[in-house]
Amino acid sequence: MDTDSTHVRLSAIGIVAVSLFLALFMRLWFLQGIDRQAFEAASVSNRVRVIHEEGPRGRILDRNGKILVDSETSIVVSLDREPLRKMEEPERNAVFVSLADTLQQLGVPTKLSLIEKRYADLRYAPQEYVPIADDVDPSVEIYLMERADRYPGIIVERKAIRSYPYGNLAAHLLGYVGEINEKELVERGGQLPGSENSSTTAPTTTAPTTTAPSTSPGSSSGADSGTRLTDYRLGDSIGKGGVERSYEADLRAVPGERTIEVNAKGDLVDVLSLKSPVVGDDIWLTIDIDLQAHAERLLAAKIQDLRGGRDKDNNRLNAPQGSVVIEDPQNGQILAMASYPDYDPSVTVNGISQEQWEAFNDPNSGLPLVNWALQGTYAPGSTFKLYTALAGYNSGYLRDGTEVVNDPGVYTIENCKGEKCEVRNAGSTPHGTVNMASALTVSSDVYFYKLADKFWNLTDQYGETPIQDAAAQFGLGAKTGVPLSGENPGRLPTPASRKAAFEARPDLFMTGDWRSGDNINTSIGQGDVLATPLQIVNSYATFANGGTRYQPQIVTKVTRPNDLTLPANDPANYKLIRQVEPVVQGTIQIQPDQYAKIYDGLLGVTQSALGTASASWQASKTAWPMAGKTGTAQVSKKADTSLFAAWGPAGTGEPARYAISVVVPESGFGGEVAAPLAFRIMEPLSFGTLLPACLSADQSACAAAADAASAASGNDVTSGSAD
């Protein structure tokens, strides 16, 4: 019995032992065979990295090839979190403390909390380098490289950043770049860290460029653009505004890729493969930087001079912002676009601090990031009379423009019942007998009041919107199509839009009805009418060329450089990728004799002794006559908005070469502020005596020379007529 029991127990032990050995054998066979590839892949993943390399963005040039935005090398200190994660927390913290202290001593203000925050930042993929200090001095790079063993997990590399040779000039037009955010990344087909489609093989790291970029002069634009638009990583730069944003697909470099082998500490062992980035294409703007600098300088000086003054009604002249736009009437090219206040785009290069961002968006600072030339909307005042004049002819109410009106300075609205049945000229000034031409020259509101009143009382004959229809032909009430983000369409009110607005928000309107008073206000650019300075200049450029409305353009061509060390404007040094051709948006039909009547009236604004801008033009005469219209728009409880729109040459038989609009809110009469400023800007342009724009390094001396030249010309006057 005992023998049998012992035998059974030994048999059981044997079976268990064999089972254990069999399980161990099967596990070894599985590890060496079936799962070998997975372990090999994991091993490769731990020692091989594919590094995503951004290349230098393309340059932005003015129409003559002067470099306005370039790329330069910046030294960046970053964290390599892979080796840092393998450390014990006390050891890792010691590295962070030492690094923060060292950077502080080397003149790079860096808080320990920033390093800790960046280390834990989930926006970056696990293997991505995380920047903690940008644009450091080369001495910092040397110091850290010589002591690499004391700073494990800390790398120093180089990347391309934007530089601005002309400083703040054209900042609103050029725009700025910033780090791509998650929304932008997803929109462009990029992948967020940890997403399902992220690679599970060799990790991809975003790193600064360390190799010379290829210009690939023979590659096609189409082949490059797909890569440029989709191969983004968090940490990459992207255009955030202006030309940088609108032409991102051209400016962005085709990213490169570097496959490297590292050891357990993260140190470089070998470069396994290298694909250099392809530098972005160059964008040639339509603007002339010399003219841009001239316009910006005079605009800023005028606004600063106005502030703190008082108008005739004792309203404070705050002049919170202003803009100047100059356009070529023959093709729609924008030659200058000045917006004040401006900003320094270089502060955005390494990211905008919260403090700086709040300052940019503080209304008390004038909102310097806003491009007031295309985002600001203002009542156009009497500059709107051009469209009302055209409506008079288009409707058939006016035949040849010789019809006269007696202007006693006040007009009584027909069929009006109530207290507010009288409307007046500025200052109730009487102008006597006026026709179309003279009404424009002296800015007779009464003439246009009567025209608008007749339209509304005879809607069965002229319809409800003859004035709005004429203004729409000039592009008001719609975006111009300029290839810049953020453009405001303005507002062109109609009886239908008033009714819809009332139904949507009855608390904001007394009634949804459109009345004669609304028509009258609209006829002189008041009431609910709003326009941008860009819309105004484009409409006057349209009239100046005879009626062809062009889409405003800001780019002439896109090129690919052969050699970045050679002059950018040498045709032998670049390949043309595409030329930007003029785009016709519409044509205004008007009889030659009717066109001539309006033309003569606008020419008289500057050339007639009675013109509202004649005194200003006499003080700052251009090489040829100019025609245009002053505007003074009333704003409740504020000083008036000053406007002027004009073109030249005018009245000489030559094609118009330049159209200009000037808008300065809360500054006073158009004939006293905007018109004199416009002539001062146009004077050296017309004579060919524009001074070269100052490079950023020469700003002080160059600006002093420009001020001296301006003072020598003796044209610092602001006198003029009321409107």
Residue ranges, per PLM feature:
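N-terminal leader/targeting segments and the immediately adjacent pre-domain N-terminus
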Residues: 144, 279-303, 698-700, 707-723
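Short, gly/Ser/Thr-rich active-site loops of penicillin-recognizing serine hydrolases
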Residues: 568-577, 581-583, 677-723
